[in-house]
Amino acid sequence: SMYQLWKMILQETGKNAVPSYGLYGCNCGVGSRGKPKDATDRCCFVHKCCYKKLTDCSPKTDSYSYSWKDKTIVCGDNNPCLQEMCECDKAVAICLRENLDTYNKNYKIYPKPLCKKADAC
């Protein structure tokens, strides 16, 4: 679910997901997609592409199990679609952490009309 994604992002980055990434660049947040502005935005682009592969579950509402062990996200005992969703969320949270050093405050609330058409997944 969105709540689990936000929690993973907080655990990995130390940043509150909604204010930090909710409107970041062209790909972070609901419904947006465009040519990534930077590495952080590319994390979100890849995450949206990961979600597009999910056919039997809904990322916004369905919940999966995971745990936080030794500062590591461990996806739990889920059905195949929920497991894949958990792995998508885990990957974006780690990607955002790995790119914290290039997080650009100028992209925090980026006007979506300025986004150019995205590449295909």
Swiss-Prot record:
InterPro entries: PLipase_A2, PLipase_A2_Asp_AS, PLipase_A2_dom, PLipase_A2_dom_sf, PLipase_A2_His_AS. Residues 105-117 are annotated as: Important for membrane-damaging activities in eukaryotes and bacteria. GO terms for cellular component: extracellular region. The record marks K105, K108 as: Important residue of the cationic membrane-docking site (MDoS). It is found in: Secreted. Keywords: Disulfide bond, Myotoxin, Secreted, Toxin. Gene3D superfamilies: Phospholipase A2 domain. GO terms for biological process: arachidonate secretion; lipid catabolic process; negative regulation of T cell proliferation; phospholipid metabolic process. GO terms for molecular function: calcium ion binding; calcium-dependent phospholipase A2 activity; phospholipid binding; toxin activity. SUPFAM superfamilies: Phospholipase A2, PLA2. The keyword Disulfide bond applies. Expressed by the venom gland. It comes from the Eukaryota. Disulfide bonds join C26-C115, C28-C44, C43-C95, C49-C121, C50-C88, C57-C81, C75-C86. Belongs to the phospholipase A2 family. Group II subfamily. K49 sub-subfamily. Monomer. Snake venom phospholipase A2 homolog that lacks enzymatic activity but shows high myotoxic activities. In vivo, induces a mild edema when subcutaneously injected into mice foot pad. This is Basic phospholipase A2 homolog GodMT-II. It comes from Cerrophidion godmani (Porthidium godmani).
